[in-house]
A protein has these predicted regions:
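Conserved catalytic alpha/beta core of Sir2/sirtuin-type deacylases, generalized to analogous enzyme cores
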Residues: 1-155
Length: 155
């Protein structure tokens, strides 16, 4: 597996056993905090504990900047290194699986095209049509919670 690129921020891919080195959480995650000023990062539990201890609005210990969960907020730029890692994974994939995504939000929507141009097969599992359905080697319509267990049972 070249990698897993997810737009989810819930950390379930890690809990399911995906290697951190192969995981790209393109919209960030809720496990960490990030300072909006200096970029300092750490476990979100540290900030939560500071709130529990009485701090109303914990500030960055490095620069006194504003802390937030390490998720991408509306209007905030994606992390360039994450985009690069996602594009690199797409470029070396033998089979690119697009699961549970409309493939309409860029830059993630461009990943299947990168994979196809590199010679990858494309399979799409989604409840609705996507712009890449006509280019896919396989398209499965349905709810991923039902479709994926059925696929796993066949393998």
């Amino acid at each position: 597996m070249a990698g897993v690129v997810t737009q989810n921020v819930d950390g379930l891919h890690l809990k399911a056993g995906t290697s951190p080195e192969r995981l790209v959480e393109i919209h960030g995650n809720t496990r960490e905090f990030v300072c909006m000023a200096c970029g300092d990062r750490g476990p979100i539990d540290v900030v939560v504990e500071r709130v529990r201890s009485g701090e109303e609005d914990p500030r960055c210990l490095e620069c006194n900047g504003i802390l937030k969960s390490a998720t991408i907020s509306f209007g905030q730029n994606l992390v360039p290194e994450d985009i690069d890692r996602a594009q690199s994974a797409a470029a070396v994939a033998d089979c690119f699986l697009a699961i549970g995504t409309s493939l309409t939000v860029y830059p993630v929507a461009a990943m299947p095209e990168i994979a196809l141009r590199a010679g990858s097969n494309l399979a799409i599992v989604n409840a609705e049509e996507t712009p890449y359905d006509a280019y896919a080697d396989a398209v499965i319509r349905g709810q991923i919670g039902e479709v994926l267990p059925a696929i796993v049972a066949l393998v």
